[in-house]
């Protein structure tokens, strides 16, 4: 450990400078780390990091931050904290959490607290809306096996679905209203097209979700069926009679 007259501190284990601390920052020499550590994905399960936090053994349902920051607007307040940490649930792998919220009071007191979850299987949960320039869903035919064309009846399925306006609440447990929306109900869609509905766990409760891609496919099929019906309606009456006669007689 080296301390300069200006108060700067340098950590140099075995004579190699690893970190430098002064009154405004902490600087870590990451190049020392990369020179002696593997950079492949397959090894990361056993590799630590230049800054490494080991929480050790923890309880079955808990969350501990790894790093946290906080700021407040001068003369206005709105003390906000952001942290990255690990959440543990019973009998399962951990979740990476990014939490953004008030540092003035708890969520129980009505203060904001958004928790973004990153699960081990690649699933991501957001408590709010997503705003993107576009969203692309993998739909390559090479990824789809056992294909079977959807049978007729899509138009009837669509007609049986009811469209509602409703207040969307945050969760099964938290009934505070997010905003007014319009849409369909997952339970209704599940009766007509079960492939379009999935079940996920949100805040300890099972919640049904809808695949917009599947709903779009159902609408496309319904439009195709409607198009055939319109063509039939536009067909002249005598042409229809001729078609029926041609089934029984050949000229």
UniProtKB/Swiss-Prot annotation:
Keyword Magnesium in record: no
Where in the chain is the site Cleavage? Answer: 139-140
For this UniProt record, give its keywords in alphabetical order, as a comma-separated list: Host-virus interaction, Viral attachment to host cell, Viral tail fiber protein, Viral tail protein, Virion, Virus entry into host cell
Gene Ontology terms describing biological process: symbiont entry into host cell; virion attachment to host cell
Q: Does the keyword Cell inner membrane apply?
A: no
**Location(s) in or outside the cell:** Virion
**Which InterPro entries does the record match to this protein?**
S74_ICA
Gene Ontology CC entries for this record: virus tail, fiber
Question: What's the subunit arrangement here?
Answer: Homotrimer. Interacts with the receptor-recognizing protein Gp38.
| All residue ranges annotated as the Peptidase S74 domain in the record | 139-237
In Swiss-Prot or TrEMBL terms, this protein is called: Long tail fiber protein Gp37
Sequence segments annotated as region (Interaction with the receptor-recognizing protein gp38)? 134-137
What is the similarity comment for this entry? Belongs to the S16-like long tail fiber protein Gp37 family.
Q: How is it modified after translation?
A: Proteolytic cleavage and release of the chaperone in the host cytosol stabilizes the folded protein.
């Amino acid at each position: 450990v080296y301390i300069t007259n200006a108060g700067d501190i340098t950590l140099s284990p075995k004579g190699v400078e690893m970190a430098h601390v002064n009154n405004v920052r902490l600087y870590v020499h990451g190049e020392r780390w990369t020179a002696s550590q593997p950079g492949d994905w397959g090894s990361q399960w056993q590799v630590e990091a230049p800054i490494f936090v080991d929480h050790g053994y923890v309880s079955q349902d808990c969350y501990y931050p790894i790093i946290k920051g906080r700021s407040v607007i001068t003369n206005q307040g709105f003390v906000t904290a952001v942290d990255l940490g690990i959440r543990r649930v019973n009998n399962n792998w951990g979740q990476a959490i990014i939490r953004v919220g008030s540092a003035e009071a708890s969520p129980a007191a009505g203060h904001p607290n958004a928790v973004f979850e990153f699960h081990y299987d690649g699933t991501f949960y957001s408590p709010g809306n997503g705003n993107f320039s576009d969203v692309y869903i993998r739909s390559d035919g090479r990824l789809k096996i056992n294909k079977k064309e959807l049978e007729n009846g899509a138009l009837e399925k669509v007609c049986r679905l009811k469209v509602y306006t409703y207040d969307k609440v945050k969760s099964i447990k938290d009934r505070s209203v997010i905003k007014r929306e319009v849409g369909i109900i997952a339970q209704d869609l599940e009766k007509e097209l079960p492939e379009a509905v999935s079940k996920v766990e949100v805040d300890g409760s099972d919640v049904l979700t809808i695949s917009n891609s599947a709903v779009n496919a159902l609408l496309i099929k319904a439009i195709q069926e409607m198009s055939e019906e319109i063509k039939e309606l536009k067909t002249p009456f005598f042409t229809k009679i001729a078609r029926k006669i041609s089934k029984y007689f050949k000229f």
